[in-house]
């Protein structure tokens, strides 16, 4: 497997709809000239943006967190240009971008250092071959202070790894009917 460059990312997005909407360059400023957390195509990756819909974890109902039987009341919905995550808590969000991963590609997501340096960790599982959808993002606030996440700005970087032509997977995410295939919006745990 080899990591793919900006040229490959642009080609796959523009000719095959791998990323929609797609930004061919790096965006660092908004229309008013204010600095943003960058997003768009980088040398060997794509920096995704957070959509303006969040689910912030709350313990107001004192439910048990169970991935096999997840209670939606564990979250408060927040819509807006920013989201405040309580100390030592987390929030779910989604990418603005919709992904269509080719059969011979595995995509790994890493958090941006701008957030990591503030104690905010982004977690996403790999985007498997032939998976498609909005990526659900998990933001952990590891600090004992409230933390702010910005919608419409960069939050994580996707790295694309392509297998050799003679080593394409036998069974893709789509082939096995993965439970998160085609997800739109912030998607909670499914079993």
From Swiss-Prot:
It catalyses: dCTP + H2O + H(+) = dUTP + NH4(+). The keyword Nucleotide-binding applies. GO terms for biological process: dUMP biosynthetic process; dUTP biosynthetic process; nucleobase-containing small molecule interconversion. SUPFAM superfamilies: dUTPase-like. Its EC number is 3.5.4.13. Pathway: Pyrimidine metabolism; dUMP biosynthesis; dUMP from dCTP (dUTP route): step 1/2. DCTP binds at residues 112-117, 136-138, 157, 173, 183. The active site is at 138 (proton donor/acceptor). InterPro entries: dCTP_deaminase (IPR011962), dUTPase-like_sf (IPR036157), dUTPase_trimeric (IPR033704). Keywords: Hydrolase, Nucleotide metabolism, Nucleotide-binding. The keyword Nucleotide-binding applies. One of its GO terms (molecular function) is nucleotide binding. Belongs to the dCTP deaminase family. HAMAP family: dCTP_deaminase (MF_00146). Catalyzes the deamination of dCTP to dUTP. Homotrimer. This is dCTP deaminase. It comes from Psychrobacter cryohalolentis (strain ATCC BAA-1226 / DSM 17306 / VKM B-2378 / K5). The lineage of its organism: Bacteria, Pseudomonadati, Pseudomonadota, Gammaproteobacteria, Moraxellales.
């Amino acid at each position: 497997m080899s990591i793919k460059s900006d040229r490959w990312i642009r080609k796959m997005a523009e000719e095959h709809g791998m990323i929609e909407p797609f930004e061919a360059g790096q965006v660092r400023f908004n229309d008013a000239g204010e600095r943003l957390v960058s997003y768009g195509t980088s040398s060997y990756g794509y920096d995704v943006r957070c959509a303006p819909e969040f689910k912030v974890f709350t313990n107001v109902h004192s439910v048990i967190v169970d991935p096999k039987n997840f209670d939606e009341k564990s979250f408060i919905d927040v819509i807006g240009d920013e989201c405040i995550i309580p100390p030592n808590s987390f929030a779910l969000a989604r990418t603005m971008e919709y992904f269509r991963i080719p059969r011979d590609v595995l995509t790994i997501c890493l958090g941006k250092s701008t957030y990591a340096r503030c104690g905010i960790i982004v977690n996403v599982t790999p985007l498997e071959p032939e998976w498609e959808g909005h990526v659900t993002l998990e933001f952990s606030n590891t600090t004992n202070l409230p933390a702010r996440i910005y919608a419409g700005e960069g939050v994580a970087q996707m790295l694309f790894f392509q297998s050799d032509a003679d080593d394409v997977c036998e069974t893709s995410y789509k082939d096995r009917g993965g439970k998160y295939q085609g997800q739109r919006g912030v998607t909670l745990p499914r079993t």
